[in-house]
Curated annotation (Swiss-Prot):
It is found in: Plastid, Chloroplast. GO terms for biological process: alpha-pinene biosynthetic process; diterpenoid biosynthetic process; green leaf volatile biosynthetic process; monoterpenoid biosynthetic process. Residues 1-36 form a transit peptide. Keywords: Chloroplast, Lyase, Magnesium, Metal-binding, Plastid, Transit peptide. This is (-)-alpha-pinene synthase 2, chloroplastic. The gene is TPS-Pin-2. It comes from Picea glauca. PANTHER family: OS04G0344100 PROTEIN-RELATED.
Length: 627
């Protein structure tokens, strides 16, 4: 939650002024605020949870607070030192040859005289092939082939599921679970009720006590399928509980192998926090080693070689984009914002983990820039700025004119221009992609976002703890999800006409749920540190206020249950087979939610970015794979 510094204020009268000030009122407010230079670091305060506070004194004597965040981990010299040879044409030519060979594998499954045709395993071959290219991160090359394969599988799907082949007498758990997951992810109407057929007479999922490798693989696919659950699907909840317990027990018995590593990865990250490029990197390490899951009629070596080449070719593009991003960061004046967290490389990493198609450079860079700005603003509203300054800044941003920054404190002048220039720049890129000017739309999102910050400012200054409903509605906006997603997705080569955009952005259910996950998950990771800084309002504290006698643990359980429900709702909004909006138009908003969720998986990974987040940067951006 972005809450405002309780440092001494130049004037408290500004707090109740309208944020839609006229130019005359804005100038009047300006006269109450002295122009400030950048602050100098002062005495260290008592540490609070994982992040301590530092008291600073600005040039005009105003006492301020700064979060004692660690500095940018990825300096310019390091980024410039990265080297790669995978941008050479020979690697791209080699990849193109392999793409052609993999297409032949797909096509031979569909030809009547193809050597891969087998009525006893033609269904599982197709599903396995689609699942493999997706997990290896190379599916973008085979969209037509994937559709053809899944159309074929779906034509044999029944209320009993599927067997290995079209002539299989009975359905089996492995084929049905993997088929359910894969078909559902592509928008086919498949019911989870098929899983009830794999329960015993007591209504429980049943497996043999021996836990063979084949059975473990089937239960692993059951677990993966259970994560693509929709609201109200009790059988999916039961499948998740059963399969998770089964796999955890299996890990205690089986030897260390590619299968055991795959189980650990899937149990660790699930689906909603298993980012596609991260999964590709992990799956490259285990693919082809597991003889139980490999298909002798499919050349896994060629699939693996292509996956490695594609990973490293994109790595060479990442290097160029990172060099550009670091130059932008320096040229924009961002390093002068010493009060904030600088996580532009980390945000770029998240973007490249969910959108690694070469043509989506604008999305990756736009997302990194926008999230960097949001984070600096969060720290400005949260700790460094006074209420008067922040109200002045918010009103000036609504005027959207560089002259409005003239009366701002010096540090805010720089911040104003970073926002102004970057939003305009991304809008220009969006206009090229969408064929229309989207600036007014973007400004509306930014205005509402900053208004939500000011609402939180009033709560903390007046000591008001809102109801859960008040906090939740405002908090979904102040989470920043909508602001972070809107402009970057409009730079993509995906049409977003107004009737589609309203189903993806505000006021859509998709947008609402994505914002909710970020707000709720962020609160569960940050509320203790926020409270130690005097920032009381969170979903946990507001829920406890509404329900006297509820313990903190009870409140956390309630919020975590809400998150699970919201995730299922978000799954439905993305994959609803009756939706008039294609999955391709919704997927990147959904994946942005996954990226933010990953950042809060273990802790506040945006404040403490030198542990899991650093590992993600190294594994998916810095280090290539070995061919």
């Amino acid at each position: 939650m972005a809450l405002v510094s309780i440092a001494p204020l130049a004037s408290k009268s500004c707090l109740h002024k309208s944020l839609s000030s006229s130019a005359h009122e804005l100038k009047t407010i300006c006269r109450t605020i002295p122009t400030l230079g950048m602050s100098r670091r002062g005495k260290s305060a008592t540490p609070s949870m994982s992040m301590s506070l530092t008291t600073t004194v600005s040039d005009d004597g105003v006492q301020r607070r700064m979060g004692d965040f660690h500095s940018n981990l990825w300096n310019d010299d390091f980024i410039q030192s990265l080297s790669t040879s995978y941008g050479e044409p020979s690697y791209r030519e080699r990849a193109e040859r392999l793409i052609g060979e993999v297409k032949k594998m797909f096509n031979s499954m569909s030809s009547e005289d193809g050597e891969l045709i087998n009525p006893h395993n033609d269904l599982i071959q197709r599903v396995w092939m689609v699942d493999s290219v997706e997990r290896l991160g190379i599916e973008r090359h085979f969209k037509n082939e994937i559709k053809s394969a899944l159309d074929y599988v779906y034509s044999y799907w029944s209320e009993k599921g599927i067997g290995c082949g079209r002539e299989s007498v009975v359905a089996d758990l492995n084929s049905t679970a993997l088929g359910l997951r894969t078909l559902r992810l592509h928008g086919y109407a498949v019911s989870a009720d098929v899983l009830n057929l794999f329960k015993d007479q007591n209504g429980q999922f049943a497996c043999s006590p021996s836990q063979t490798e084949e059975e473990i693989g089937s239960v692993l696919n059951l677990y993966r399928a259970s994560l693509i659950a929709f609201p109200g699907e009790k059988v999916m909840e039961e499948a998740e509980i059963f399969s998770a317990k089964y796999l955890e027990e299996a890990l205690q018995k089986i030897s260390v192998s590619s299968l055991s590593q795959e189980i650990r990865d899937v149990l660790e990250y699930g689906w909603h926090t298993y980012l596609p490029r991260m999964e590709a990197r992990n799956h490259i390490d285990v693919f082809g080693q597991d003889t139980q899951n490999s298909k002798s009629c499919i050349n896994t070596e060629k699939l693996l070689e292509l996956a490695k080449l594609e990973f490293n070719i994109f790595h060479s593009l990442q290097k160029r984009e990172l060099e550009y991003l670091v130059r932008w960061w320096k040229d924009s004046g961002s390093p002068q914002m010493t009060f904030g967290r600088h996580r532009h490389v980390e945000y770029y990493t998240l973007a490249s983990c969910i959108a690694f198609e070469p043509q989506h450079s604008g999305f990756r860079l736009g997302f990194a820039k926008t999230c960097h700005i949001i984070t600096i603003l969060d720290d400005m509203y949260d700790t460094f700025g006074t209420v008067d300054e922040l109200e002045l800044f918010t009103a000036a941003m609504k005027r959207w004119n560089p002259s409005a920054a003239d009366c701002l404190p010096e540090y805010m002048k720089g911040m104003y221009m970073i926002v102004y220039d970057t939003v305009n720049e991304i809008c220009q890129e969006a206009e090229k992609a969408q064929g229309r000017n989207t600036l007014d739309y973007a400004r509306q999102a930014w205005d509402e976002y900053l208004d939500s910050y000011m609402q939180e400012a009033k709560w903390i200054v007046t000591g008001y703890l809102p109801t859960f409903a008040e906090y939740y509605e405002n908090g979904k906006v102040s989470s920043g999800h909508r602001t972070a997603a809107l402009q970057p997705i409009l730079t993509m080569d995906i049409p977003f006409p107004p009737h589609i955009l309203k189903e993806v952005d505000f006021p859509s259910k998709l947008n609402d749920l994505a914002c909710a996950i970020l707000r709720l998950r962020g609160d569960t990771r940050c509320y203790k540190a926020d409270r130690a800084r005097g920032e009381e309002a969170s979903s946990i504290s507001c829920y406890m206020k509404d329900n006297p006698g509820v313990t903190e643990e009870d409140a956390l359980d309630h919020i975590n249950a809400m998150i699970s429900d919201v995730i299922r709702g978000l799954n439905w909004e993305l994959l609803n087979p009756n939706s008039s909006v294609p999955i391709s138009s919704k997927k990147h908003v959904f994946d942005i939610s996954r990226a933010f969720h990953y950042g809060y998986k273990y802790r506040d990974g945006y404040s403490v970015a030198n542990i899991e987040t650093k590992s993600l940067v190294k594994r998916t951006v810095i280090d290539p794979v070995t061919l």
